[in-house]
């Protein structure tokens, strides 16, 4: 309603009093009324109020209804509408210099190269120009669409359909009384009866017919029976009309096409906001992004992978100081492949590189190259490398490169062919670099084994940087990074706490450690603790390892007793076997999918003997043996234990060559989720493998049964104590079973003994001392924040 009235009144006549109102000191909706502002204007508005009083009254109603419209003045009127704080301090002599528009700002404001931020009040500018407040192009489109819809609605739903009658009624009421002017046979389906003007109130009536021949015979017979002379008989006219069914059938198709066209125009592939301006032809443009200086990750935030950090620092140094290497005849490596398990910090290391290196950093995901259109992948690869050459020297990071870098020749479907074409284009582009391009390509993947050899060869990715799970020193460094933002208890030392937590989390990756610290803070907040304490971290570690604690899960007394003796069997076997992992805690409170939970502290070692693996198998069978020994029956609770025992036995026989009958051979096992189409050994060998696995598992079971038979009283003690307390710590186990008869390591200092210093070696080589600044800078100017390493 506002737009309609303003347009009718004339925008120029209404714009002048609006500007006077703002000049006189404020918004009508934020403290006063429009008429008070008018009185404050004085003589300036006295001559114009007679002509525009109605417009001002309308503005007063609207401002009281929606003050948000006037909470911010339009552009061009900021100096007339100042904040209350600035009104007192502002003086007539102070002038604000006009804001300089950006060089490449779009029509919407000063947002940058691609249009930037739009106007807050575009309708006000149009009113100043004497135009309607709405956009003409959009209004014309909407007007045409609305007119078409209205016309169709009026035609199909408001036309007079006439009154339907029967043949008998037509003969008796119209034909016999001589009220018929003419008969119109429409589309050979029905007859429209046009009465003589002035005889009836209806314009026409109609009735259906079976066929034209039958209608003609019946009409002739009826007129003969009524004695109507041939000269007075009703005229019959045959016409063809459209009933709109064809147009109605086209409506769904037209609506669907309109929606698709609108989506293509306004969406990412169209020319609307956020589009690249090329419609369907823009799908071949790269989706790679050039990261700006708003990356808040630095190398100081990356720990536990110092060797990989040195490699990445050297790549940045290649681009910053190429002369240092070219003087010795060295060539800049073209790329590096970051590999390793999930959560070890590959992408985080790339983010830190983007935050530290003051060279352009271009990032893209491997899955963004493959789309529904054929040829999009190679086109985007070409466009991406063209962008990289344009911004050289720069770093190009391709995350999850296995999406396009899989080995070729493994499929014949269209998607596989498109992936191979994208990979071929990638190979060509990487080979097309010369030594002066100064573009370094980094890539990250969790599956280096499935990559094409042509992609990983030297000359494309010269270096393979493996980032594995951190050791105990690396975990301590990672804990220090993630403990920084936490509000710890005043009695806790970050160094001591990080070392203790590192000893409690063997095998954890950087992502797991980050999750532990976050869970500890959440647990502390859940209990309204003023700070994060050590017990919160212990609970968080149990939460990550064992899953969610289910204290409300109801177990039958018999089931609870079975679970208690099952866990007691695990604990006792591990306590009296030399190569078993030390026990930290055992609980019969359900966690995750399990009904019981035991936490061990495994040693970090890379080489295992046959005796060590055999003791681990015995420890995993302790629960099943305890059930058989104390209850005379077995349950399904040992399913996960049996699966691990079977995997360990097959690995010893098939992969590690620890079987005397099978010999010193090793066969590959399929990965989890993969299927082995063809076995690499014969049926006789497969039968021998199965026999050896059964024999090994049987030996472990018999040894475990013998051990628990000897320690039956100890298992009974642990089982009864578990039923009483539900959770047993290591101190409780020492009280019940006595000290463990074998030496074990449990502290950080014991684990790192004999490995040099207590912390990671973070020293840099001489050539990388000033890795993040050019030699020509002379040590005075730095690109970005230097790494503290």
Curated annotation (Swiss-Prot):
Question: Which annotated residues bind ATP?
Answer: 302-303, 344-348, 482
Pfam families associated with the record? AAA (PF00004), AAA_lid_3 (PF17862), FtsH_ext (PF06480), Peptidase_M41 (PF01434)
For bias type Basic and acidic residues, the affected ranges are 767-789
Q: What class of enzyme is it?
A: hydrolase
Which InterPro entries does the protein's record reference? AAA+_ATPase, AAA_lid_3, ATP-dep_Zn_Metalloprotease, ATPase_AAA_core, ATPase_AAA_CS, FtsH, P-loop_NTPase, Pept_M41_FtsH_extracell
Please state where this protein is localized: Mitochondrion inner membrane
Residue ranges crossing the lipid bilayer per the database entry? 139-158, 246-264
GO terms assigned for molecular function = ATP binding; ATP hydrolysis activity; ATP-dependent peptidase activity; membrane protein dislocase activity; metalloendopeptidase activity; zinc ion binding
Q: Where does Zn(2+) bind?
A: 566, 570, 641
Gene inactivation phenotype reads: No visible phenotype. Conditional deletion of both Afg3l1 and Afg3l2 in mature oligodendrocytes triggers progressive motor dysfunction and demyelination, leading to rapid oligodendrocyte cell death. Conditional deletion of both Afg3l1 and Afg3l2 in mature oligodendrocytes also causes premature hair greying, due by progressive loss of melanoblasts that share a common developmental origin with Schwann cells.
This chain's function reads:
Catalytic component of the m-AAA protease, a protease that plays a key role in proteostasis of inner mitochondrial membrane proteins, and which is essential for axonal and neuron development. Afg3l1 possesses both ATPase and protease activities: the ATPase activity is required to unfold substrates, threading them into the internal proteolytic cavity for hydrolysis into small peptide fragments.
Subunit architecture: Homooligomer. Forms heterohexamers with Spg7 and Afg3l1. The m-AAA protease is either composed of homohexamers of Afg3l2 or heterohexamers of Afg3l1, Afg3l2 and/or Spg7.
Query: What's the name of the protein?
Result: Mitochondrial inner membrane m-AAA protease component AFG3L1
Q: What's the source species for this entry?
A: Mus musculus (Mouse)
């Amino acid at each position: 309603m506002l737009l309609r009235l303003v347009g009718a009144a004339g925008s120029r006549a209404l714009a002048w009093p609006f500007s006077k109102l703002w000049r006189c000191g404020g918004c009508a909706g934020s403290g006063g009324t429009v008429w008070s502002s008018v009185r404050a204007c004085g003589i300036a508005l006295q001559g114009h109020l007679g002509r525009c009083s109605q417009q001002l009254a309308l503005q007063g109603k609207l401002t009281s209804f929606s003050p948000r419209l006037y909470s911010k003045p339009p552009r061009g009127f900021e100096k007339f509408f100042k904040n209350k704080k600035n009104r007192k301090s502002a003086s007539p002599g102070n002038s604000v210099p006009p804001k300089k528009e950006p060089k490449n700002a779009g029509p919407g404001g000063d947002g940058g190269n691609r249009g930037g931020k739009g106007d807050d009040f575009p309708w006000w500018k149009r009113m100043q120009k004497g135009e309607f407040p709405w956009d003409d192009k959009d209004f014309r489109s909407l007007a045409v669409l609305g007119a078409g819809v209205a016309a169709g609605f009026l035609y199909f739903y408001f036309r007079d359909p006439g009154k339907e009658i029967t043949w008998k009624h037509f003969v008796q009421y119209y034909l016999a009384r001589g009220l018929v002017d003419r008969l119109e046979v429409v589309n050979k389906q029905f007859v429209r009866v046009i009465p003589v003007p002035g005889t009836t109130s209806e314009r026409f009536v109609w009735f259906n017919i079976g066929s034209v021949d039958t209608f003609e015979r019946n009409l002739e017979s009826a007129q003969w029976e009524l004695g109507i002379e041939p000269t007075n008989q009703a005229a019959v006219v045959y016409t063809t009309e459209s009933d709109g069914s064809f147009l109605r059938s086209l409506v769904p198709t037209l609506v669907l096409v309109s929606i698709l066209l609108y989506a293509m125009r306004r969406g990412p592939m169209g020319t609307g906001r956020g589009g690249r301006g090329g419609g369907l032809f823009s799908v071949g443009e790269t989706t790679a992004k050039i990261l700006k200086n708003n990356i808040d990750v630095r190398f100081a935030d990356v720990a536990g992978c110092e060797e990989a950090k040195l490699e990445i620092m050297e790549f940045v140094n290649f681009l910053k100081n190429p002369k240092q290497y070219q003087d010795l005849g060295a060539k800049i490596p073209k790329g590096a492949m970051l590999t390793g398990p999930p959560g070890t910090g590959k992408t985080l290391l790339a983010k830190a590189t983007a935050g530290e290196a003051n060279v352009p950093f271009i990032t893209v995901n491997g899955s963004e190259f493959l789309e529904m259109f054929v040829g999009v992948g190679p086109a985007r690869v070409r466009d991406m490398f063209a962008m990289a050459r344009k911004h050289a020297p720069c770093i190009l990071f391709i995350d999850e490169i296995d999406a396009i870098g899989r080995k070729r020749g493994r499929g014949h479907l269209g998607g596989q062919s498109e992936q191979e074409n994208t990979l071929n284009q990638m190979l060509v582009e990487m080979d097309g670099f010369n030594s002066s391009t100064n573009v370094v390509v980094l890539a990250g993947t969790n599956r280096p084994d499935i990559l094409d050899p042509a992609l990983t060869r030297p000359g494309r990715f010269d270096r393979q940087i493996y980032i594995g799970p951190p050791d105990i020193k690396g975990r301590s460094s990672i804990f220090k990074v993630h403990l920084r933002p936490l509000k710890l208890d005043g009695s806790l030392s970050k160094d001591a706490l990080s070392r203790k937590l590192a000893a409690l989390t063997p095998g954890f990756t950087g992502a797991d450690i980050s999750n532990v610290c976050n869970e500890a803070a959440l647990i502390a907040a859940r209990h309204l603790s003023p700070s994060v304490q050590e017990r919160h971290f212990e609970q968080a570690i149990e939460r990550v390892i064992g899953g969610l604690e289910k204290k409300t899960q109801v177990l039958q007394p018999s089931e609870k007793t079975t679970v208690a003796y099952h866990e007691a069997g695990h604990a006792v076997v591990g306590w009296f076997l030399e190569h078993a992992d030390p026990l930290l805690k055992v609980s019969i409170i359900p966690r995750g999918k399990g009904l019981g939970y035991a936490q061990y502290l495994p040693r970090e070692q890379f080489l295992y003997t046959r005796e060590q693996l055999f003791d681990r198998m015995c420890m995993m069978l302790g629960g099943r043996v305890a059930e058989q020994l104390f209850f005379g029956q077995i349950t399904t609770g040992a399913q996960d234990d049996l699966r691990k025992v079977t995997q360990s036995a097959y690995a010893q026989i098939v992969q590690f060559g620890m079987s005397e009958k099978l010999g010193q051979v090793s066969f590959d096992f399929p990965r989890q989720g993969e299927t082995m189409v063809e076995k690499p050994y014969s049926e006789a060998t497969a039968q021998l493998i199965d026999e050896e696995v059964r024999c090994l598992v049987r030996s472990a079971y018999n040894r475990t049964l013998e051990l628990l038979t000897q320690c039956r009283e100890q298992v009974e003690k642990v089982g009864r104590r578990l039923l009483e307390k539900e959770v047993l710590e290591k101190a409780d186990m020492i009280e019940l079973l006595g000290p463990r008869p074998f030496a074990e390591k449990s502290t950080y200092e014991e684990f790192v003994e004999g490995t040099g210093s207590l912390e990671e070696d973070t020293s840099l080589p001489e050539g990388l001392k000033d890795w993040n600044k050019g030699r020509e800078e002379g040590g005075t100017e730095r690109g970005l924040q230097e790494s503290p390493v």
